[in-house]
Amino acid sequence: MQIKRMLNGTFNAGEKMKSTEVYKIINLIIKEDFKALGYKKTKGGMLGFYKQINKFYVIFWFQCSQSAFNFYTGSKFTIEFQLSETDGIGSEAIERHRISHYLTQEELKYITKKENEIRKNMKKPPSNYSLLNMSDDIKKWFMKNYEPIRDVYNNDTDILLRYIEEKNIKEWAEYFKNIIKRIVGVLEQKAMSQERPLIVIG
């Protein structure tokens, strides 16, 4: 039932989404673009793509948060990039960074603004909600989700892209599609270099 609703584009705010469903939404938006660029799907549970360049592999993948989807605050995912000598996600890498490392200042500003817009649209739980009736630390931790990000993200921020409904996932995927093309283009150039790139792990 959930997958049928997802394919019809009818996931609404607060409606639980599994990571597999999130990956399917993203895949529908980006797969043809990267297939045309010579990328193949990686193995495993996460949504990833790889391309062999000489004896190197350029890889990128999407990874949902390990925390379960919350009715009020949704969930998050990140995007990671890797240049390695094998096609396995998370294998020993020559270069590996999450998305923030490669973003421009304008992109960082946009993502910060987008996160704040999503937070503004999140419903607040009733006073009898379980997490609000635990310790003060847990209550503060949960309510922090509703506080606006005051400082613009930077290249060292571990950016997690929040979603509370299917619309958010689609918008993130559309926004990052061309950014990912730019980043993998840089990694492809490194892979085509005659000399082995310096090892850089982020």
For each predicted feature, which ranges?
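Acidic, metal-coordinating catalytic segment for phosphate/diphosphate chemistry
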Residues: 34
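Intrinsically disordered, low-complexity regulatory regions enriched in serine/threonine/proline
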Residues: 3, 7-29, 41-43, 48-202
